[in-house]
Amino acid sequence: MEGGYEQGGGASRYFHNLFRPEIHHQQLQPQGGINLIDQHHHQHQQHQQQQQPSDDSRESDHSNKDHHQQGRPDSDPNTSSSAPGKRPRGRPPGSKNKAKPPIIVTRDSPNALRSHVLEVSPGADIVESVSTYARRRGRGVSVLGGNGTVSNVTLRQPVTPGNGGGVSGGGGVVTLHGRFEILSLTGTVLPPPAPPGAGGLSIFLAGGQGQVVGGSVVAPLIASAPVILMAASFSNAVFERLPIEEEEEEGGGGGGGGGGGPPQMQQAPSASPPSGVTGQGQLGGNVGGYGFSGDPHLLGWGAGTPSRPPF
């Protein structure tokens, strides 16, 4: 009985050891660890499944935005390829340094002056040459200066007053024989339909002994050597009479209350009748051996001056 009890007692101790809490804890721990790994793996799969729809929706939003930007008219493929979804701000580099195209005037202004250098051949009439040039070009010519040599010049000179305040010699035409150097030549030549007498040339000449004479040119003016003229041409010239009409009306009203006197705008009579080129025969005489015909008082040289050699 004791042996059987001992055997039974040993078996009870063996079974008692099997049911100890430490053994149960050691056996349950690996099983619990496996369950925790499986649970963590399951949670990770659920999290990935939740993120996948959000990523798909985000990609669809990006595709819609790109499609919208490509449909816009101001989208640039170059900028969209370099920085998608962004537009460059500011001015492109180097845009301020671009060369501007030059301004080219294709036609002249009708009121502009043109400069000309005119050469008159020897033996030609200077007045006729300039008049023909103005008529063919249809432009007015303003002669600013000239140099050269002319011969047998015909001038119209003004009236010279006498010592007592009266007129000692009437205005007329004087012809100078010989060769003369041009000191100054100015005036204007207008093409038709300009009124007659609107233009004219004035000249100053020097003789061989240093004498200077001048006046208005009466054609012809023959060039004995090449004559160079500096001139300017113009067009669209407007001819106007001065004073203007408003002043004429005011002057006419004021003159009417003056007791029957002549109107203020009436042209005053000339002090001496004008003489043409044909009036040279009326100016007989010779001044101290000078080779020109006319009144000796026209050039300011009196009849009592001593004789001088010709030019």
UniProtKB/Swiss-Prot annotation:
Tissue expression: Expressed in the hypocotyl and the vascular tissue of seedling.
Subcellular location: Nucleus
Ranges where the record places region Required for the binding to non-AHL interactors: 178-183
A Gene Ontology term for the protein's cellular component: nucleus
Signal sequence, start to end: none
Residue stretches of biased makeup (Gly residues): 252-262, 278-292
Positions in coiled-coil regions: none
Keyword DNA-binding: yes
Mutant phenotype after disruption: AHL27 and AHL29 double mutant exhibit a long hypocotyl phenotype in the light.
InterPro entries: AHL15-29, PPC_dom
Record key words, sorted: Apoptosis, DNA-binding, Flowering, Immunity, Innate immunity, Nucleus, Plant defense, Transcription, Transcription regulation
Molecular function (Gene Ontology), one example: histone binding
Region named Disordered: 40-105, 246-311
Stretches with biased composition (Low complexity): 263-277
Note: Overexpression of AHL27 results in a decreased flg22-induced expression of FRK1. Overexpression causes also delay of leaf senescence, late flowering and modified leaf development.
Assembly: Homodimer. Interacts with AHL12, AHL25, AHL29, TCP4, TCP13, EF114, ATAF2/NAC081, histone H2B.1, histone H3.3 and histone H4.
UniProt comment concerning the protein's domains: The PPC domain mediates interactions between AHL proteins.
Name under which the protein is recorded: AT-hook motif nuclear-localized protein 27
Species for this entry: Arabidopsis thaliana (Mouse-ear cress)
